[in-house]
From Swiss-Prot:
Keywords: Capsid protein, Host cell junction, Transport, Viral movement protein, Virion
Record-given protein name: RNA2 polyprotein
Keyword Electron transport: no
GO terms, biological process: transport of virus in host, cell to cell
Gene Ontology CC terms: host cell plasmodesma; viral capsid
Leftover remarks: Virions are comprised of 60 copies of the coat protein.
Length: 1110
């Protein structure tokens, strides 16, 4: 595999090529990579993931300075994309050039002038198109008045199928003007040729008018005045070159996306529009076509809104129509470009003695943004939506409260079209300290996209006395990439409200549409537990959605203290982040360190339970600390999540476990939190916690030097089934806390850390979760979860030390005299050997006063004693992140996954050897060893050998040494350990049995094969074997199919359904209503041995990852 050489320019070219939809030049990507180290690391990791792509090899396999794209002036993109290298010419370019004498071309005579009567197409000529085409000709002759008089007589458009009638005055014009018809006539209709087959001939004269009474003087005078006014109007239009244009705005459908941590506690976004740079759009189409375009645009907008709302409705219990009503309350006003706030007559019903609504909606906030604040300089504006005069007026009428039914934010930017500067406005309730609860809504846009509006229906109600504090609505304005001058006015931001004043004896008179939007918004807010719905216009001049980072409460803060008076306020802030596309909203409550708590992106997190773990001051390796029961944590806390659990009954949550402890880099302690879903290891770790148990179940490392740590538990995947609120079914979920590496420095006293459990309990739709493993012949894809090697300890007194990690990953773990089956070892035991590239990570668990330089290589048959040879081996140094990637070295290209009993691991297998080429070092007086923990994440490009038992039967159990003739064995609908008091039982040892042992539940169909041997002569044996399928129990159950096999048959076959009424069964004998199998022997002592083999049929599923001690 070629070595990659990285540079900022190469990474910028890679990022630009992978994200063509974001646009931007190579220099802009290069500036982003140089200024953001985390972004550079993200791009580098993406290159490493796709290092096998030809384009990646051509870009990064050259040394820096000699690559095809290193020189900005001579980038060979053709080679990067195609791999073609231009060959050197073998002869002069003109060696084979053939000189052809030029051919003299005789010009053709000019074409005969065509008649000016051109056919009329499907769309007849319009007045505006005809005027524009003719003004160019008449402007040269200064005949505006004559043209206006002629054109005024033309109809607006001709009906389809009607003959074309042209005035005589126009037909008498000169032949040079006939080309103007091409600008407004289509050649797809033959009506004109049918009317005038001879070419430029005058149309037939109109028939003489019928004889009638001559008009009176008044009628003739009125007709003359009308003709004169019409001629003047059209003369003015033609002289100025005006057109009656159709004016409209482009409606951009709003995109409503939930935040990454699933929190929303504010109002809901109803609609948003964008008018790109307020262009006037001139339409030369007929009115029928303009109407068709408008209807088509509306249909596309409704379809995009439906797709966005359909996904939102699918996440909640609301119907699609309910979600649409909550989010599109004022969407019908977007197309006209009007404000989104509905008129008062549409929002409120009249009330009072004189039928007058006590509402006001004219007091708005309008301010000019002079320089966009970026970074920590977030602009904060405290705004009171109700004037003091208005409050005094309605207070005298007996009103005691104000209700903000709707709030609109409008951003009208100034500057160049297409400017990618982003701008975000966040609206919150000013009297709420919790940001998530105070959130009303947010609007983000690019300044180059023009006017953008958003409307929210918060339903905010507050007292008449509160507005005097001048802080009802807080607005936060920020940008992430502003590049314009600081003293320029960039945008006008307006905030309008729709409100009403109510009293103790007054009912709210909000219209049904507004009320429905508020009710659905409240329901949505309660369902999603506060997800911030953020909108942003898309599809305008600047594509995509902005990425905002608003420091709430920090930087420049202004408070309105009067009509034209403001004051500055400084407050410690929080962070409001909007990621492009994902539209996440994160709130930073940890103001001390300034880092937001890690959150999941799929569920809303609410505190469900808590517990504490006591830590001794001298916490040594292998120390057992405490076990916390997840069910007891939730029920003991008795919070709102427990009430939801009782209501839902059956839940399958995603837990977020936050372990809060102070960071200390001098102790060197590393704890392990093990998730034991089926209570398999509790009895094995009460005295000493061996890593053979704590690292065999799903686990997480807690480093004391890192401080507070969080981890996610997908209960449906790790446990395998849902949990009932007041009793256990198959599970007994525990969190075990043990010490993996002990402390070097004893602390002053015993202490404890806090464990918080966050979850959102929603009713589960099924009992079983996702299967952890599905049996098939090629189930392994190279990736691991929770594969951690016990600590490697380096002695401080040795030099040139090394530690080896054996790659016998399919070997069963041994703890003293006990075998421990876990999932990773069992998974690899399905194969004889494996090769590939090992990817993993090294955790340095020592105190910060220790130091070491590690180099990892892969070796076969032990380690090398020649260090010069060592540095010739392929290897890598362990950096700060601890990641490593090394190919397995073996003379067989694979390493065995298990060994024979007499073989040693160091003599016949590949190992990962971690050489301390420098160190370990520590201050004087330190004697403790330096612990290092290795985690293996993946074996990339796995080179698997043949399976251990490809598509074959596994041995389940052998019965022998029968002591009675009438023997009966009950085989329940589960694969479990069978015992007997009247015969000797020997259980089979195979990968399938191990996989059953290290899972909580299993489900599928087994093909059973029964074989036996006889004691006496073959022909003299009598008796038989009866196999009966039953359901339920013997007393009240039901009998199914049955078959009898004579002993002389020496065997028979049947099948066994694994599962119960719930879907799956554990590997222990549990009395649940299910199918089972009875095997009866009437002459058991005539048999020497009874053997039962099994083979999984189809997709055999395993649920709930755990381990098992034999």
């Amino acid at each position: 595999m070629a070595k990659f050489y990285y540079s900022d320019r190469r990474l910028a070219c890679w990022a630009a090529g992978k994200n063509p939809h974001l646009g931007g030049s190579i220099e802009s990507w290069l500036a982003a990579i140089k200024s953001d180290s985390s972004f550079r690391q993200t791009v580098k990791e993406d290159v490493q993931v796709n290092r096998l792509q030809p384009t990646a090899v051509r870009m990064f396999s050259w040394k820096v300075g000699s690559g095809p794209i290193d020189n900005p002036e001579k980038c060979n993109w053709h080679y990067v994309l195609t791999g073609e290298v231009p060959a050197q010419p073998t002869e002069p370019v003109k060696a084979r050039e053939v000189v052809v004498p030029p051919v003299k071309v005789i010009p053709s005579p000019p074409p005969v002038p065509r008649p000016y009567f051109r056919p009329v197409g499907a769309f007849a000529p319009t007045r505006s198109g005809f005027i524009r085409a003719t003004v160019e000709r008449l402007s040269r002759k200064r005949e505006e008045s004559r043209a206006a008089a002629l054109f005024a007589e033309l109809p607006l458009e001709y009906p389809q199928g009607a003959p074309l009638v042209v005035p005589r005055g126009f037909a008498a014009m000169r032949w040079t003007y006939h080309a103007t018809w091409r600008r407004w006539y289509d050649a797809s209709d033959e009506r004109a040729l049918r009317v005038h087959p001879g070419g430029p001939a005058l149309p037939p004269p109109p028939p003489p008018p019928p004889i009638q009474k001559p008009p009176s003087f008044e009628e003739r005078l009125q007709a003359a005045l009308e003709r004169q006014s019409c001629a003047r109007a059209f003369a003015l239009e033609t002289s100025l070159g005006l057109n009656m244009a159709w004016l409209g705005t482009a409606a951009i459908p709003s995109t409503s996306v939930c935040c990454a941590d699933g929190r929303t506690t504010g109002g809901q976004t109803i609609a948003q529009e964008a008018d790109p740079i307020n262009h006037r759009v001139t339409s030369n189409t007929a009115p029928g076509r303009a109407q068709w375009i408008s209807e088509r645009r509306s249909a596309l907008r409704r379809r995009e809104q439906a797709n966005s709302l359909q996904s939102l409705a699918a996440q909640t219990d609301m119907t699609f129509e309910q979600a649409r009503n909550a989010y599109l309350g004022a969407a019908d006003m977007v197309e006209q470009g009007l404000p989104l706030l509905p008129p008062l007559r549409n929002a409120y019903a009249p009330r009072g003695l004189w039928r007058g609504p006590s509402t006001r909606a004219n007091y708005t906030l309008d301010f000019r943004l002079n320089g966009i604040p970026t970074g920590q300089n977030t602009l904060e504006i405290l705004y009171n939506p109700v004037a003091d005069e208005e409050m005094d007026e309605y207070r005298d009428r007996g009103m005691s409260a104000v209700v903000i039914d709707a709030l609109e934010i409008a951003i009208n930017p100034f500057g160049m079209p297409g400017n990618p500067t982003d701008l975000t406005v966040v609206a919150t309730y000013g009297h709420e300290r919790n940001m998530e609860r105070a959130f009303i809504g947010s609007s983000s846009t690019f300044l180059g996209n023009g006017l953008a509006r958003a409307i929210f229906f918060p339903g905010l109600q507050y007292s008449q006395e509160e507005p005097r504090r001048e802080s009802i609505i807080r607005l936060y304005v920020a940008s992430t990439n502003a590049t314009v001058d600081a003293d320029s006015i960039l945008a006008a931001i307006s905030v309008g409200t729709l409100r009403q004043h109510i009293g103790s004896l007054h009912n709210r008179t909000v219209a049904s549409s507004v009320h429905a939007a508020q009710v659905q918004g409240t329901t949505l807010r309660a369902t999603m537990m506060g997800n911030a719905v953020v909108v942003s216009p898309e599809g305008s001049l600047v594509t995509g959605t902005p990425e905002a980072n608003v420091q709430i409460g920090s930087g420049s803060s202004m408070r309105m203290v009067g009509p034209l008076a403001w004051e500055n306020v400084e407050e410690p802030g929080q962070t409001f982040t909007i990621r492009n596309r994902s539209r996440s909203m994160r709130v930073d409550r940890n103001a001390d360190v300034g880092v937001a708590l890690p959150r999941m992106s799929t569920t809303t997190r609410g505190l469900a339970g808590r517990g504490s773990v006591q830590v001794p001051k001298d916490c040594q390796a292998g120390r057992y600390l405490k076990t916390l029961d997840l069910r007891d944590m939730v029920s003991g806390f008795s919070g709102i999540q427990y009430e939801k659990w009782i209501t839902a009954g059956l839940v399958m949550p995603d837990f977020k476990v936050v372990i809060r402890y102070p960071a200390n880099a001098f102790t060197g302690i590393t704890w392990v939190m093990s998730f034991d879903a089926y209570n398999r290891i509790t009895s094995s770790i009460t005295t000493t916690a061996s890593p053979a148990y704590t690292l065999s179940v799903p686990h997480w490392l807690l480093h004391h030097k890192n401080g507070t740590t969080s981890c996610d538990i997908d209960y449906g995947e790790l446990c395998g089934h849902a949990m009932w609120f007041n009793a256990t079914t198959f599970e007994s979920p525990k969190l075990h806390f043990t010490c993996l590496t002990g402390n070097n420095k004893e602390l002053a006293a015993d202490w404890e850390f806090v464990v918080e459990l966050y979850a959102e309990f929603e009713a589960a739709k099924t009992f079983l979760g996702r299967p952890n493993f599905v049996y098939s012949a090629d189930a392994f894809n190279g990736s691991f979860k929770f594969l951690t090697i016990p600590p490697l300890e380096y002695d401080l007194s040795t030099t040139s030390a090394y530690k080896s990690v054996s790659l016998l990953l399919g070997q069963t773990l041994i703890d003293g005299t006990h075998k421990v089956y876990n999932y990773n070892n069992t998974l690899l035991s399905y194969y004889l050997g494996i090769g590939g590239v090992v990817k993993g990570r090294v955790h340095i668990c020592s105190p910060c006063t220790y130091g070491i330089v590690l180099r990892v290589v892969s070796e076969w048959n032990g380690v090398t004693n020649n260090w010069n040879q060592l540095f010739k081996y392929p290897g890598c140094y362990i950096g700060e992140d601890g990641n490593f990637e090394i190919e397995i070295r073996s003379p067989y290209h694979r390493t065995p996954l298990r060994l024979l009993d007499a073989q040693a691991a160091s003599a016949f297998t590949s190992t990962l050897n971690f050489y301390a080429i420098s160190g370990p070092i520590a201050p004087s007086g330190e004697t403790a060893k330096m612990p290092v923990v290795v985690q293996i994440d993946e074996i990339a490009l796995p080179d698997l050998s043949v399976p251990s038992f490809p598509n074959d039967y596994f041995l389940w159990v052998d019965f022998s040494a029968f002591t009675v003739d009438a023997e009966e064995y009950v085989i329940g609908s589960r694969f479990f350990d069978i015992s007997s008091t009247t015969s000797t039982v020997h259980l089979g040892d195979n990968p399938f049995a191990h996989m059953i042992a290290c899972h909580g539940l299993h489900h599928g169909i087994l093909d059973l094969k029964l074989m036996w041997d006889l004691e006496g002569e073959f022909g003299k044996s009598s008796g038989g074997v009866t196999i009966t399928k039953l359901c339920g129990d013997k007393a009240t159950g039901m009998d199914g199919a049955s078959r009898v096999c004579a002993l002389q048959n020496m065997g028979c076959e049947t099948e066994l359904y694994i599962g119960n009424f719930a879907g799956a069964n554990p590997n222990s004998a549990l009395s649940l209503y299910s199918r089972w199998l009875a095997i009866k022997l009437d002459k058991a002592r005539s048999m020497k041995m009874l053997r039962i083999l099994c083979k999984p049929r189809g997709n055999f599923e395993f649920y709930g990852r755990t381990c098992f001690r034999v």
